[in-house]
């Protein structure tokens, strides 16, 4: 139909626009009905449709507004737009009459010259006249119907038969009109987008460091998918589901896609939150449709990513009734995936989650998710294989020491290593920008001084780069470099020019400080940067920690030969500031194990059960990061002695930690270090063998140890010392009695501050400077002074000694000595000293 264009510029009301649109819609439906009836007549007479005749007689099938009645439009408008029912009837009638006349006038202007259009205007009755006539017809029809019914009472025939036999032309016309309206309405049915269920392009060969997981998946999934006849002949039901769990970024989604690509079977990947719908029952229908599609594509794999979003625990964990229904529907659908109902073709479900404990217990039983596979944080060997696999398609220049990179990336998961490779590639790309930009420094002029501020002097880059932090090496390039490069090379680079672009080992080292591991973002620390070189003295304690933790991680086979398989626990206790936390960090670094540092009070929560959940979460994360060292600082706040005065919540926290340390859960590869100043306040059950069985007393350093500590501090901090500094004289000073390692660090720091004051503020004029001018005074005094001229002298140390006071008094030292004798550790210390000698 050629749509009639109306003069919509003359319309001033939204109601007018709405009525005109509905009139055109009615005309389209009438035209479609007439075309359909003409086509049926022509097929009955000639057997085929003659398109040429349709073009010649186009006006025969077109329905015009002059053929409509106001009453017909009134009924159609109320049926199609329910909002018009709120409009007053009189206003609607007048609007329809006015708009119908406008449309007829538009038709007359456009089609009046065509011979097929009958331009003889018939006088149209108004809508009020039509409604009055219709009411009269209804009243007359009612009277006639009553007369017919009363006339049949004297006859033997039934009333229903008599009524059925009557042929009311008005009723038939209404039925035909409704039928044509239904047929002529062009209903646009929303078609579902057919998703691609073909196997992914990836394969298991592209994955590295996951050999154990791949072997389990091929046994549980690959064998039933490729050879279901083995299970059918033996009558063994193959597994219906496998649950993959582990920290974010460890490769759960990647291995599911790679497995489907390796097996070359249809793969239905679903993001679990996409199943949830706002309408009641729609979410369950989506799950049923997904499983019906899976059965039609069998054998196939169905992958639910983040499945914990739709399967929470129903015992209070599910907040709404809809979540309970979704869990129940998923359980029912998985139970129906038997070999009999899938025609001997298995359908296996793979679920992925970061929180397996939040899933409903019914989902984790046998027959649903039969097996659970934990994807741990990769160790050093796994990281080496992952880096090699990720670098297969990279253009690498020279030999890259991936083994060293694997050592430098403890706590990194696959996603973190991918980010490292990408950042290294970014460094290489920026290098070619700087190489081809060829920017040279030019003299500064008054007109281009603003541009010169952005230019780079390549000759100075070598000296300046050594002073910058490597974390800033991959900062965005200056705009002038990019502009100059684009100006010099507007066309794509040639192959010869691109041959210089490659990724070097230095690019990886530059990119490494910029990558923050996922574990550190979630609040779990990785391996610290403290080594034994940063620890002064404490030789006896270092030896014990090396035998208890470092060597079992580095060389576990030696301990297994003598029957030692369970990891040990160590309690470090002593006065504050003696290096307990520093020792724990150094142990984690030396063993190259993952490190989780927990401040005792931070796990405590005022809500019931939250503290226990936090403890379980720490050990769950540690199991996924084996080998791992958990360091509990201020342990006495977390596990106080249980007695009648202890609250019930604190007792539950102690019990939870005790069961995690030596309960039914496997603690293989998890080493625990506790630190406290008050070992007498810790519950005795924590100190029994199997938990924190080794207690090491970190006492105040003696004279030789103090000398070693202060030398280590000045060396590690890079403190510039004068030749007259005599550390032995400083240590022998009576004011250094009872000094701990923290006190000695404060002494070195205070002496450095005094050296700065002596260099910058030699006079007392600074006291008269106003507060708001203090920064300016400092800048004026520091002009022309370099850092190399600042030297810490012996007088600075003597002045600092007068300010620093020991953190442990004589009374506190005697208390710790008595506590050491009370715990019976003196003999152990003597034995350790003899072993050292």
From Swiss-Prot:
Gene Ontology terms: biological process: ribosomal large subunit biogenesis; ribosomal large subunit export from nucleus; ribosome biogenesis
GO MF term (any one): ATP hydrolysis activity
A Gene Ontology term for the protein's cellular component: nucleus
SMART domains noted in UniProt: AAA
Pfam families: AAA (PF00004), AAA_lid_3 (PF17862)
Keywords of the record: ATP-binding, Nucleotide-binding, Nucleus, Phosphoprotein, Repeat, Ribosome biogenesis
Nucleotidyltransferase as UniProt keyword: no
Subcellular location: Nucleus, Nucleolus
Residues recorded as bearing Phosphoserine in the entry: 42
Compositionally biased region (Acidic residues): 43-56, 449-461
Taxonomy, superkingdom: Eukaryota
Basic residues bias spans: 176-192
Record keyword Repeat present: yes
Primary role: Involved in ribosome biogenesis. Seems to be required for restructuring nucleoplasmic 60S pre-ribosomal particles to make them competent for nuclear export.
PANTHER family: AAA-FAMILY ATPASE (PTHR23077), NUCLEAR VALOSIN-CONTAINING PROTEIN-LIKE (PTHR23077:SF171)
Protein's recorded name: Ribosome biogenesis ATPase RIX7
Species: Saccharomyces cerevisiae (strain ATCC 204508 / S288c) (Baker's yeast)
